[in-house]
Curated annotation (Swiss-Prot):
<feature type="signal peptide">
    <location>
        <begin position="1"/>
        <end position="18"/>
    </location>
</feature>
<dbReference type="InterPro" id="IPR023346">
    <property type="entry name" value="Lysozyme-like_dom_sf"/>
</dbReference>
<keyword id="KW-0998">Cell outer membrane</keyword>
<dbReference type="GO" id="GO:0071555">
    <property type="term" value="P:cell wall organization"/>
</dbReference>
<dbReference type="GO" id="GO:0008933">
    <property type="term" value="F:peptidoglycan lytic transglycosylase activity"/>
</dbReference>
<dbReference type="InterPro" id="IPR001638">
    <property type="entry name" value="Solute-binding_3/MltF_N"/>
</dbReference>
<dbReference type="GO" id="GO:0009253">
    <property type="term" value="P:peptidoglycan catabolic process"/>
</dbReference>
<comment type="similarity">
    <text>In the C-terminal section; belongs to the transglycosylase Slt family.</text>
</comment>
<dbReference type="GO" id="GO:0009279">
    <property type="term" value="C:cell outer membrane"/>
</dbReference>
<comment type="similarity">
    <text>In the N-terminal section; belongs to the bacterial solute-binding protein 3 family.</text>
</comment>
<dbReference type="GO" id="GO:0016998">
    <property type="term" value="P:cell wall macromolecule catabolic process"/>
</dbReference>
<feature type="region of interest" description="LT domain">
    <location>
        <begin position="268"/>
        <end position="484"/>
    </location>
</feature>
<keyword id="KW-0456">Lyase</keyword>
<keyword id="KW-0961">Cell wall biogenesis/degradation</keyword>
<feature type="region of interest" description="Non-LT domain">
    <location>
        <begin position="19"/>
        <end position="267"/>
    </location>
</feature>
<dbReference type="Pfam" id="PF00497">
    <property type="entry name" value="SBP_bac_3"/>
</dbReference>
<feature type="active site">
    <location>
        <position position="312"/>
    </location>
</feature>
Length: 484
C-alpha cells in the first residue's frame, strides 16, 4: 500500500512538473495561434517592408515591388486584405515586428543568425550576397585589407556582426552606421562621389545600377545567403504553417518565378556603356516626348511605350534602317499604311501608330495567356512577326513546356534559328535570339525609367540640401563606440 501511495505521489508530481514545463509552450502556441486568428478576425494582413527599387515602391499605378506582389498573393491565400507598412530602415522594421505592429517583415532580408534566435523564418525564396561597392573610375579595392576609409553602412542588418568577424584578419577595418539614410540612398551617395564605399545587398546593388550605372562592385563580402520573410516568435505556429504551404504552392506554380522575372531577372543584362547612355537620354531627351507617350498609351503604361521607342530608335524621330523601317517606333511602310499615318518621321504620328499596332497585336495573343504576360508575347510579335511568335508557342508545347507561360516560351525563342527546329515550323526560320534580347532590353529600359523618376522624386522630397560634400548624412555611429 505504501509503495502504491508513493507511486501515486510521484506520478502526481511528474504531472505537475510536466504541466509546469509545457505551460509556457502552450501559452506561446496559443499566443501565436491567436495571431493567425487575429489576422482572420480583423480581415487584414499587415506586412512591414522598406522602400527600395525591388521590394516595395509606389509607382504610377500604386503599390508595386516583389515583396508587395508576394505579400498580396499571400493575403489572397489567407482570404484577407493587405496593408503594407513602409519603414525607413531594417532596424525600424525588426522593432515593429518585435512590438507586434506588423505580422511579417518582408524586405529582401538575408538570413540573419542573430535575428533567427528572436524571430521565426519563413521559407527561402531566392538568394543574394553582401557586396562592397565603389564609384566606377575610382581605384577598385581587391579586398577588405585595402579599405582605408571607414565603410558607411545602413542600419538594420547583421552586417556589423559580419564585419566584426573580419576584424581578426583585418584589424584596421572600421565602419560607421548611418542613422538617416537607407541602403539605396547610400548607394546613390557612392554614385555621386560623396562617400567612397558602402556594403549592400547584391539585388539592391543591381537595381540601383539601372539608374546609376556609375556604381561598381569591387567584390563579394559574403557568399550568397537565402532570403526570407521574418515572423514573430521563434516557435512553430499556424501562421508559419500557412506561409509554408503558400510558398510551396507559389514556387511549384511558378508565381515566384514570374515575380522575379518582372523585377530583377533582367539585371544580369547590365551593360555600363549602354546604361550610362540610356540614363543620359532619360534626363535629356525623354522629357520632350513623355507627354506623347502618355497621350497615346491606351491600356499600356506610358513608360513601357517609351522603353519600346528607345529600343527601336533611341528616341530619334528621324531614325532609318537599311530594311526600310523609319521613325520613332521604326514602323514599316505597310504598318504605317495599316495604321493610316502619312509621315513615319513625325514623332506624334509614329508613337500613335506604334501604340495602336501594339494594342492590335495584344488582341491577337491567345486568350489562354495570363493578362500580365500578354504584352511580352505581343512584343515578340512586334519584333519578329506574329506568325513566328505562334511558332515559338507550338515549339514550346512540343518540347514539353507550357505555351502560355512566358518563361517557358522565352527560353525557346533562340531555337527558332536552329536548323534542327525551323524546317518543321509553320513560318520557318526566325532570329528568335534577337526577339529574346529585344524583350529583355525593353523590360530593363522600362524599369530604369520607373526607378529613375522614383529616385528623383525621393530626392526632391528630401528635406535637406544635397549639393555639397558638407551635406553628408549625419549623425554617424562609429563601430568602435557602438556595435550592433
Amino acid at each position: 500500500m505504501k509503495g502504491l501511495l508513493l507511486r501515486i505521489i510521484a506520478a502526481f508530481a511528474l504531472v505537475l512538473w510536466a504541466i509546469d514545463m509545457v505551460f509556457p509552450w502552450q501559452q506561446m502556441m496559443r499566443s501565436e495561434e491567436n495571431r493567425y486568428n487575429a489576422i482572420q478576425q480583423r480581415g487584414k494582413l499587415v506586412v512591414g517592408t522598406v522602400n527600395n527599387p525591388v521590394s516595395y515602391f509606389i509607382g504610377n499605378e500604386g503599390q508595386a515591388g516583389l515583396e508587395y506582389e508576394l505579400s498580396r498573393a499571400f493575403a489572397d491565400y489567407l482570404g484577407v486584405e493587405l496593408e503594407m507598412k513602409a519603414m525607413d530602415n531594417g532596424e525600424q522594421l525588426f522593432d515593429a515586428l518585435e512590438d507586434n505592429e506588423i505580422d511579417i517583415a518582408a524586405a529582401n532580408l538575408l538570413y540573419q543568425a542573430k535575428k533567427a534566435e528572436t524571430f521565426q523564418l519563413g521559407p527561402a525564396y531566392y538568394s543574394a550576397s553582401w557586396q562592397l561597392v565603389y564609384r566606377k573610375g575610382e581605384s577598385r579595392p581587391q579586398s577588405l585589407s585595402q579599405i582605408k576609409d571607414k565603410l558607411i553602412i545602413a542600419r538594420g542588418s547583421e552586417l556589423p556582426l559580419i564585419l566584426q568577424g573580419y576584424q581578426t584578419k583585418y584589424p584596421n577595418l572600421k565602419w560607421q552606421l548611418e542613422n538617416n539614410q537607407t541602403q539605396e540612398e547610400l548607394l546613390l551617395q557612392v554614385a555621386q562621389g560623396k562617400i567612397k564605399y558602402t556594403v549592400a545587398n547584391s539585388i539592391d546593388v543591381s537595381a540601383v545600377q539601372q539608374v546609376r550605372p556609375e556604381i561598381a562592385v569591387a567584390f563579394d563580402v559574403t557568399d550568397e545567403a537565402s532570403v526570407h520573410w521574418y515572423l514573430p516568435n521563434n516557435s512553430y505556429n499556424e501562421l508559419q504553417a500557412a506561409l509554408l504551404d503558400f510558398m510551396n504552392t507559389a514556387l511549384e506554380g511558378g508565381l515566384i518565378a514570374r515575380i522575379e522575372e518582372k523585377y530583377f531577372n533582367h539585371f544580369s543584362q547590365f551593360d555600363y556603356v549602354d546604361m550610362r547612355q540610356y540614363v543620359q537620354a532619360i534626363n535629356d531627351i525623354l522629357p520632350k516626348y513623355a507627354p506623347l507617350f502618355d497621350r497615346y498609351k491606351g491600356d499600356l503604361d506610358w513608360r513601357l511605350l517609351a522603353a519600346i521607342a528607345y529600343q527601336e530608335s533611341h528616341w530619334n524621330e528621324n531614325a532609318t534602317s537599311p530594311t526600310g523601317v523609319r521613325g520613332m517606333m521604326m514602323l514599316t511602310k505597310d504598318t504605317a499604311e495599316r495604321m493610316k499615318i502619312a509621315d513615319r518621321t513625325d514623332a506624334e504620328q509614329s508613337i500613335k501608330a506604334g501604340s495602336e499596332y501594339l494594342h492590335w497585336l495584344i488582341s491577337q495573343v491567345p486568350d489562354s495567356i495570363p493578362k500580365e504576360d500578354r504584352i511580352w508575347f505581343a512584343l515578340t510579335g512586334y519584333n519578329m512577326g506574329l506568325g513566328h511568335m505562334l511558332d515559338a508557342r507550338r515549339l514550346t508545347k512540343n518540347l514539353g513546356g507550357d505555351p502560355d507561360n512566358w518563361l517557358d516560351v522565352k527560353k525557346n525563342l533562340p531555337l527558332l534559328a536552329e536548323k534542327r527546329y525551323y524546317p518543321n515550323l509553320k513560318y520557318g526560320y526566325a532570329r528568335g535570339y534577337e526577339a529574346f534580347q529585344y524583350v529583355e532590353n525593353i523590360r530593363r529600359y522600362m524599369n530604369s525609367i520607373i526607378n529613375y523618376y522614383r529616385v528623383q522624386e525621393n530626392a526632391d522630397n528630401k528635406d535637406k540640401p544635397s549639393e555639397t560634400d558638407e551635406n553628408l548624412p549625419l549623425p554617424l555611429t562609429d563601430n568602435q563606440e557602438k556595435q550592433e
